[in-house]
Amino acid sequence: MAINETDVKLFVDSWKQGVLDIKNVYDNKGDYQEQASKFLETHYLFETESVLFKPTLTREEIFRNSFDRALSYFIGGDIDEDKGFAIQEWKSIDTDQINILIEDELIIAMWVLSFKSDEVLKVAFTFMLKESSSDLKIKVHHSSLIK
């Protein structure tokens, strides 16, 4: 399958919606842990390969290069500093300034997401994606606050 910019944009939209879906399940007192696990399985290569993951809001344990550490970041867990990024008061997530590079097997996307609650948290993202059996998944994730 030849990956194109539309595929990458759809993946980014799916990732954003996945974060909001975790929040929705959490708000409705559902199994948000299962929802977050599905999100990671759908969007990251943790099950089959090594992944490099530098989340937005980390200070003590900067990198979360395993499934369990990533899960803790998104919903809270083993790591004291984790408050559950995906279960914050996000009402919407807007995309801006998306840049995509596709060269042979190399697929990289960089963009800005605005996480909206009572305030707006602007974050710059870079994903290095890899084609999995039938879809794209994240091999490298780096995100940082824009101040």
Task: Report residues per predicted region.
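Short, low-complexity N-terminal intrinsically disordered segments enriched in polar/charged residues
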Residues: 1-48
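Residue-identity detector for threonine
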Residues: 6, 42, 48, 56-58, ...
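Generic detection of intrinsically disordered/low-complexity segments and helix-coil linkers/edges
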Residues: 9, 33, 38-40, 47, ...
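Generic ordered-secondary-structure signal
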Residues: 14, 81-83, 97, 120-123, ...
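Generic structural hydrophobic/aromatic packing signal, biased to beta-strands
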Residues: 15, 95, 100, 127-129
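Residue-level marker of positions within ordered structural domains that often coincide
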Residues: 20, 114, 134
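Surface-exposed, charged secondary-structure patches
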Residues: 52-116
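Short beta-strand edge/turn micro-motifs at domain boundaries
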Residues: 102-110, 118-147
